[in-house]
């Protein structure tokens, strides 16, 4: 597996389906950014990071599950309707949110110990979302199967994921410095929404990896 080919194919898919992905995910991404802004206003700049995590757990499972279902349908040649995908995503939300909460806590704990354990868990759990959504398994089963599917594939997944995540992290950091809290709220909402939408790119890349590595023969 060549990471450059995976990235090329993923960018191509994202580009040709950009309008459909925008219509499907952007409204929820904007709602998430607005919710983060409201939480920050209520709790102040020194609010616990858990408030931010809670907002993410409310919205992230919805637009990510919808995107995964969209990716699967388009790969099979179908043109899925957005409301149908969102309906399925809403049905999956309780299980997805539970799994996302467990994964987030594990990765945060790993990062707290040292960076490498958190990074290891992030890679080993990278297919869990796709397993839960596409194979309709329980959160713990999805996490366990993700560990199994990534055996012997840690480094290819790591290199591919870092190749897309590092530029996005840099962009997020630079935009945070350029558009500080002194900027008007609409500007911050716009920047946060754009950054959050671009974070969907790793979902597309990991889906491509899952198609290559994780789907049954």
Regions found by a protein language model. Give the residues of each.
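Hydrophobic alpha-helical membrane segments
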Residues: 1-217
């Amino acid at each position: 597996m060549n990471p450059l080919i995976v990235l090329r194919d993923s960018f191509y898919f994202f580009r040709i389906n950009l309008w459909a992905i925008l219509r499907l995910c952007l409204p929820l991404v904007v709602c998430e950014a607005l919710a983060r802004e409201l939480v920050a206003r209520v709790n102040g700049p020194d609010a616990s990071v858990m408030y931010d995590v809670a907002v993410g757990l409310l919205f992230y499972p919805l637009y990510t599950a919808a995107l995964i279902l969209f990716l699967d349908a388009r790969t099979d040649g179908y043109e899925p309707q957005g409301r149908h995908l969102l309906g399925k995503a809403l049905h999956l939300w309780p299980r997805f949110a539970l799994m996302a909460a467990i994964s987030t806590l594990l990765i945060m704990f790993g990062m707290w110990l040292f960076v490498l354990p958190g990074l290891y868990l992030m890679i080993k759990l990278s297919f869990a979302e796709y397993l839960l959504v596409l194979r309709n398994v329980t959160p713990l089963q999805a996490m366990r199967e993700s560990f199994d599917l990534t055996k012997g594939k840690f480094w290819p997944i790591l290199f591919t994921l870092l190749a897309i995540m590092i530029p996005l992290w840099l962009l997020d950091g630079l935009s945070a410095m350029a558009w500080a809290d002194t900027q008007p709220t609409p500007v911050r909402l716009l920047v946060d929404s754009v950054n959050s939408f671009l974070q969907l790119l790793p979902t597309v890349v990991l889906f491509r990896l899952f198609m290559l590595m994780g789907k049954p023969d």
